[in-house]
Amino acid sequence: MSKEIKEYKKYSDVPKEYRFDLDYLLEGKTIDQLFDQFLEKSKKLIKIKDSKYQNIESYLESLKLEEDFNLLNNKIINYISNNISVNVVDSHFREISQKFEFMYYSFFNQIGDENQRILEHEEKITKWLLDPRLASYKKALDFVFKSKKHRLSKEVEDYLIKVSRGNIELYKVYGILTNSELDYGYALSSDGKRKIEINLSNRFNLLKDQDENIRKTTYLNWNKASAKHKETLSSLLYQHFSKLSADALARGYSSTVNSFLFEDQVDEKLLKNLYDKVSSNKKVFQKYYQNYKKFFEKKNSKQMEAWDIYLPLVVVDEKYSIEEAQDLVLKSLEPMGSEYISKVKEAFSSRWVDYLPVKNKRSGAYSIGSTHGIDKKFILMNFDGTLNSVSTLSHEMGHSMHSYFSDKTQPQSLSSYPIFLAEIASIFNELMLKDYLLEVSENLETKFHILNESILNFVGTVHRQTLWSEYEYTLYNKIDKGEPVGTYTKIDEIYEQISQKYKVSDLKNHHPEDEKNVIGVNVPHFYYHFYVYKYAIGMIVANVFYQKYKEEGKQALEFYINKFLSAGGRDWPVEILKDAGIDLYDSKIYDLAFKNFEQTIDQFVEIGNKLFK
């Protein structure tokens, strides 16, 4: 294993093999030439926006033009966004991006309300759908017809489109307040030699610091700063929810939550199953927390406090080179079969991945979307040589391979998979890597670290996101009914009530010296239109697929690739999973997921008992 990852001052200094191959997207042309093609294709679509409904042949021809337009759009978006990601202050690509945004929105405004035109020709299109040439468009068109009952008058819809750029976006106000204007104070070391300003970027690293006073002052000062603005934060969240509630009820939805579920054609029963099964499995989560607390107190000879939960019990300083990380990912995924492995090797050799952190590069990691028609499913990361970075590479490769199999198997109109399904393949890859690393590692501390990270991932995704989702669900429903819940006191009361249902730790949420943690009004995800439950579902489903693989072997992997990875968006999410052997309305699927999770906890406890005596 390598000890250090070489640092580079400029992106251009990074070796070519560790950078994106973005010139591939241009195919020998310039970006301005692609813009010219974009304008040419957009003019054709605008010209035929009404005449294409004259007969089925004209309509089919227009759909082909739209697909060509979308393929070009994908290349342009991939080229611009990836270039900006590797240097977020690059003025050249920012200007290019602004130019394209203007072109795109100009097209969008001229093309107008396509759904309205579809509805005006509903009778005609319904007959055309009997033609097999329109089979791949049936899902989207049927959804437009089904959505008709939730549309307002043509004049109102036109007005809403025209004034949309003036909409107040409260999540942006929330972001400015919490990212820039809140003063979180300083973390102070026990000896007084370190004084570190607390911000969103360093908060969790400070909570992992070996110095208890750094952790304590980070925890308390963060909470105090947030609590100081609790009424402002409450007002922002309440107004955001109220706006969405008013819109949903005006459009004839039975509730705000059902307006969100409608987009994925999900029944509310799925939420009830999720909330009931996760909260009823509290004992499994408690098993982890009780043992973690025991190990912590044995190691540190002190009572565990709320600011101690992120302190690592073991320090794993193993470092991996990019090539070693690639090798680990390949070996862990070997059971996936020859096509899967061949494509991952191609991803590494053909420069799908931009690996190394440099100044002004976007933080975090992603596997890019809008990939149909593009062979390279680009991945950005900030590789630092840690086990976590190896896991990130495997995770993002899961997304990219999902895109590869979906794009290869499905027509363009059905190739894109929704957020509801997006995290399953990436988490599945993490589980493959976890078990491979446990198998080959001989170091107990490394194994303990791997298991703990996997458990925390499950807890953070399933337990926390489900709690948050039921809280959102409850708050939306109260606002729909007109209940007066617009103050911090009322909102916090709701959050505390839901928290008690899921409570697994006996640690205090706040300290006598401290203002209360106002988490119920201070989570950015609450501004993302009720989607955190999808993260929990993704983790549950990935664990079910993985448990099936452990019980059934390679046959389960072939089924997973053919029925899930290759499905794209060919059907609604629940139906795709049902076809892949997982019925989300059957509460028994949670038993399989928690079985796999509890096996991981058992391994964690077994090794922890050896390390902390």
From Swiss-Prot:
Pfam families: Peptidase_M3 (PF01432), Peptidase_M3_N (PF08439). GO terms for molecular function: metal ion binding; metalloendopeptidase activity. Its cofactor is Zn(2+). GO terms for biological process: peptide metabolic process; proteolysis. Binds 1 zinc ion. The active site is at E396. Its EC number is 3.4.24.-. CDD domains: M3B_PepF. It comes from the Bacteria. Keywords: Hydrolase, Metal-binding, Metalloprotease, Protease, Zinc. The keyword Protease applies. Zn(2+) binds at H395, H399, H402. Belongs to the peptidase M3B family. This is Oligoendopeptidase F homolog. It comes from Mycoplasmopsis pulmonis (strain UAB CTIP) (Mycoplasma pulmonis).
